[in-house]
């Protein structure tokens, strides 16, 4: 499944991890899960990223969101590297599993291959891919970064909150949205349905087109 993208079901892979063997669908279960790759252990950007993800792990746990890392290094390498990650920012613990994928099969199927990066033996390396997977095992959101650019974990958390809010309330979130701010009502929802679904009411933006498509409301 090299073209894995939004709406696709992730393959039910059997994976070797720092927490033992898992099946991907069993790991996701009835929750949301963030599966994310890094190019290699014992590298600078990856160390800062994994440290930051460890720092945010408690926030994801509060939301019932699971974390699963991926790279092509073996389990023992991951375990040794985790000591460096935890020493880099003392107090942060890497409590989530990291997949060992030395044959590159998992990262190929999950669309995590970086075409421009190779290891010293010429082997494929992962890019900085991140998929948010829903309880239905479908990809809900993806980020894709090159090896030279670290991800913003605050944005990953914000995007996760937006997805959870949209799923819970059947709304959409506008630009730069943060939890607690107003959301928008999707165009397919009539005003009559909106009144029933949002008893606190909604506000329609007055625009030159006189089209009433930009409607804001507040949800918990």
UniProtKB/Swiss-Prot annotation:
The keyword Oxidoreductase is assigned to this record: yes
Residue span(s) of domain Thioredoxin: 4-165
Pfam families hit by this protein: 1-cysPrx_C (PF10417), AhpC-TSA (PF00578)
Motif (Bipartite nuclear localization signal): 195-218
Location in the cell: Nucleus; Cytoplasm
InterPro entries: AhpC/TSA, Peroxiredoxin_AhpC-typ, Peroxiredoxin_C, PRX_1cys, Thioredoxin-like_sf, Thioredoxin_domain
Catalytic reaction annotation: a hydroperoxide + [thioredoxin]-dithiol = an alcohol + [thioredoxin]-disulfide + H2O
A GO MF label: thioredoxin-dependent peroxiredoxin activity
Enzyme Commission (EC) number: 1.11.1.24
Gene3D superfamilies given in the database record: Antioxidant, Horf6, Chain A, domain2 (3.30.1020.10), Glutaredoxin (3.40.30.10)
GO biological process assignments: cell redox homeostasis
A GO cellular component annotation in the UniProt record: cytosol
Catalytic site: 46 (cysteine sulfenic acid (-soh) intermediate)
Nucleus is among the record's keywords: yes
Alphabetized UniProt keyword annotations: Antioxidant, Cytoplasm, Nucleus, Oxidoreductase, Peroxidase, Redox-active center
First-tier enzyme category under EC: oxidoreductase
Something else known: The active site is a conserved redox-active cysteine residue, the peroxidatic cysteine (C(P)), which makes the nucleophilic attack on the peroxide substrate. The peroxide oxidizes the C(P)-SH to cysteine sulfenic acid (C(P)-SOH), which then reacts with another cysteine residue, the resolving cysteine (C(R)), to form a disulfide bridge. The disulfide is subsequently reduced by an appropriate electron donor to complete the catalytic cycle. In this 1-Cys peroxiredoxin, no C(R) is present and C(P) instead forms a disulfide with a cysteine from another protein or with a small thiol molecule.
Similarity remark: Belongs to the peroxiredoxin family. Prx6 subfamily.
Task performed by this protein: Thiol-specific peroxidase that catalyzes the reduction of hydrogen peroxide and organic hydroperoxides to water and alcohols, respectively. Seems to contribute to the inhibition of germination during stress.
Name of the featured protein: 1-Cys peroxiredoxin B
